[in-house]
A protein has these predicted regions:
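Catalytic cores of histone-lysine modification enzymes
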Residues: 1-93
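C-terminal SET catalytic tail plus cysteine-rich post-SET Zn-binding segment of SAM-dependent SET-domain
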Residues: 84, 89-169
């Protein structure tokens, strides 16, 4: 795996392993680019470390009605943990030089050395999982905050959302 400049994989206070900064990153700065393998929505693959990139055709066409493609992370980016208050966001673009869809993590605020990188996994409601991010505005579940996705959260997990709403009130 390539070395991530300004970053280090280590044990995480959030969950398992994480990626921490070893230098300062400014808001809006590219923090890292992830390597991965593209799969179509109907392909069979292990999605443990996959990003969902809706609206991208496999040929790089930006089409909101296109089936989702999955970007299976194969480098250290797979260790970036979820947070309901993330400090990075993902920008995905088709790289015409490489002929591949790529994912970039961009700082959403200034990052100081020693901070763990996070992004919002924003799972669809049916795939929601309990969240342990520890953020002040934690939703209680790893789930997209869109009302349609929240409505699709399985009944047995809805109590986690009420707890999160109670903390936020």
């Amino acid at each position: 795996m390539p070395h991530l400049t300004g970053l280090r994989v280590t044990h995480s206070a959030i969950h398992g392993y994480g990626v921490i900064t070893t230098r300062r990153f400014a808001k809006g700065e590219l923090v890292l680019e992830g390597d991965g393998v593209l799969y179509r929505e109907d392909d069979e693959f292990d999605d443990t470390y996959a990003l969902v990139l809706p609206g991208w055709g496999a040929d790089g066409g930006d089409d909101p009605d296109a089936p989702a493609v999955y970007y299976d992370l194969i480098d250290q980016t797979r260790w970036i943990n979820h947070s309901c208050e993330p400090n990075t966001e993902i920008d995905s673009r088709y790289d015409h030089e490489r002929g591949a869809l790529r994912a970039w993590w961009v700082a959403t605020r200034d990052l100081e050395p020693g901070e763990e990188l996070t992004y919002d996994y924003a799972f669809v409601g049916a795939l929601a999982q309990p969240c342990a991010c520890g953020a002040a505005a934690c939703r209680g579940l790893i789930v997209d905050a869109d009302p349609e996705e929240l409505a699709a959260v399985p009944e047995e997990l809805r109590g986690h959302l009420r707890l999160a709403a109670g903390r936020a009130a």
